[in-house]
Amino acid sequence: MGQIVTFFQEVPHVIEEVMNIVLIALSILAILKGLYNVATCGLIGLVTFLLLSGRSCSLIYKGTYELQTLELNMETLNMTMPLSCTKNNSHHYIRVGNETGLELTLTNTSILNHKFCNLSDAHKRNLYDHSLMSIISTFHLSIPNFNQYEAMSCDFNGGKITVQYNLSHSFAVDAAGHCGTLANGVLQTFMRMAWGGSYIALDSGRGNWDCIMTSYQYLIIQNTTWDDHCQFSRPSPIGYLGLLSQRTRDIYISRRLLGTFTWTLSDSEGNETPGGYCLTRWMLIEAELKCFGNTAVAKCNEKHDEEFCDMLRLFDFNKQAIRRLKTEAQMSIQLINKAVNALINDQLIMKNHLRDIMGIPYCNYSRYWYLNHTSTGKTSLPRCWLISNGSYLNETKFSDDIEQQADNMITEMLQKEYIDRQGKTPLGLVDLFVFSTSFYLISIFLHLVKIPTHRHIVGKPCPKPHRLNHMGICSCGLYKQPGVPVRWKR
C-alpha cells in the first residue's frame, strides 16, 4: 500500500520532467522553424542579390570549355542500308552488305548497243538481284520527267545488271538548253545518290545550281563484288536516304510522317533512354567511347532538326534491326525504304545538298563538334562541323556558334539548378509544431513583410536565374535593352 502512495507522489515530478523535455524540444523546433522562416522571407536573398548585383549571373558555372570533336564511322551501317562512296574521278559505288554492291561509272564508252530495257521479262525470269534492283529503281524513279526511253538501255544476261543512261545530246538545241534536258535530270539524280561521297567529275554550272555539266557521255550502273572501293571518300548512307525520302510521289506522305512519327532512341531492351546515349568504338573513327547525357538525348527525342540526332537514329535503328530482325540484304533494303521518313529529316538533307551545290558551307553528316564543361562534365548536343571547298572550316569561322552554345549550356544548368532548389522542402516536420516564442514571432513578422529580393521588368515574367540591375539589363547578355522600367519583387 505504501508503495502505491509513493508512486502517486512521484507522478507530478515525472510529469514535470517530461514537460521540461517537451518544452526544450519544442523550443529547439521553434527556433529551427524561425531560422527557416528568416531564410525564406527574402532577407538573405536580398543581401545575396545586393552582393552579386552587377556581376555575371552565370559566375558559379563559369569555367573552362573544351571544344571536342567526333567523327562517325558509317561503314557499320552497311547491313541495313546502302552506302555510297567514291574511288576516283569517274567511279562511284553503292555498297550493300559485305560482298556486293553497284558501280556507277561516268564514261565516254558505250557498252550496250541497243536502246531498250526489257525489265518485265527479266523480272519474270528472276534474273537479277532484287536488293540491288530496288536501289536502281529508286534512282530511276527519282529522275525528273523521264520521258525519253531511248536514252536508257539495260541488260540482265546471266544475272548481271547493266543499266546505261545516254548523257549526250542528239541535237544542237538540246546541247544549248542542257539545263532542262533529261541528261541534266540524270546528273542531278546521280549527284544526290552519290552525295556524302564525291562527284568531282561534275560541274554545277556555277551560274545555276540545278544545271549540272559533265564531259562524259554515259552513266553506266553495274553490279559488282565489293572490294576496297572507298578510296577517295568514306562510305555514307545519306545520299541514298536523301534520294529515297525526296521521291516526288512521297513528298506529301513524308511531310505527314515527320509531324506524327519519329524513331525514338532506345536502350538495349528497347526502352527509351532518358539517361543518355553512348557511341561505341565501332560507331566512331579513331575514338573509343563517347557518351552524351540525357539533355542531348531528350532533345533528339523531342525534335527532328539536328543532323547529329538523325545519325543517332540511324545507328540505333541499325543496331535494333540487326539484333531483332536479323534481316537479309533484300529485306533490309525494303525495311529502310519504309522507315526512312521516320529516321531522318529529309529537309535537312536537301538543305545541305543545296548548300553544297551553291558553294555555301554544308554538313556532310560525318564530323561533329561539341563543348565539354570541365568542372561539371556536362556536354552540349553535338553540332555538325561544316565543310567548304572540300575541307572543314577553321574554328574561327564559327566562333560565334561556339560562344552561343556555351551560353545555352549555362542557361540550361542555371534553370535546372533553380528548379531543383525550388522542389526541395527542408524541415517539413517542423510545420507540425507551431508554438510562439519571441524569435518565432519575429520570424513570422519578417515572413509576412515579404522583403523583395530581385528586380522584374514591368509587364514581363520573373527573370530568374538572371539578375537585373537598375537599368533592367543582365551582365550575362540575355537582357540587352537598357532603361526599361523595373520594380522590386519577392
Curated annotation (Swiss-Prot):
It comes from the Viruses. A lipid is attached at residue 2 (N-myristoyl glycine). Residues 2-17, 59-431 are extracellular. Residues 34-58, 453-490 are cytoplasmic. The chain crosses the membrane at residues 18-33, 432-452. InterPro entries: Arena_glycoprot (IPR001535), Arena_glycoprot_zinc-bd (IPR043015). Disulfide bonds join 85-230, 117-154, 179-211, 278-291, 300-309, 363-384. GO terms for biological process: fusion of virus membrane with host endosome membrane; receptor-mediated endocytosis of virus by host cell; virion attachment to host cell. Zn(2+) 1 binds at residues 57, 466, 474, 476. GO terms for molecular function: metal ion binding. The record marks 33 as: Important for GP-C-mediated membrane fusion. Zn(2+) 2 binds at residues 454, 456, 462. Keywords: Disulfide bond, Fusion of virus membrane with host endosomal membrane, Fusion of virus membrane with host membrane, Glycoprotein, Host cell membrane, Host endoplasmic reticulum, Host Golgi apparatus, Host membrane, Host-virus interaction, Lipoprotein, Membrane, Metal-binding, Myristate, Transmembrane, Transmembrane helix, Viral attachment to host cell, Viral envelope protein, Viral penetration into host cytoplasm, Virion, Virus endocytosis by host, Virus entry into host cell, Zinc. It holds the Pfam family Arena_glycoprot. GO terms for cellular component: host cell endoplasmic reticulum membrane; host cell Golgi membrane; host cell plasma membrane; membrane; viral envelope; virion membrane. The record marks 58-59, 258-259 as: Cleavage. Glycans are attached at residues 78, 88, 98, 108, 118, 166, 223, 364, 372, 389, 394. Belongs to the arenaviridae GPC protein family. This is Pre-glycoprotein polyprotein GP complex. The gene is GPC.
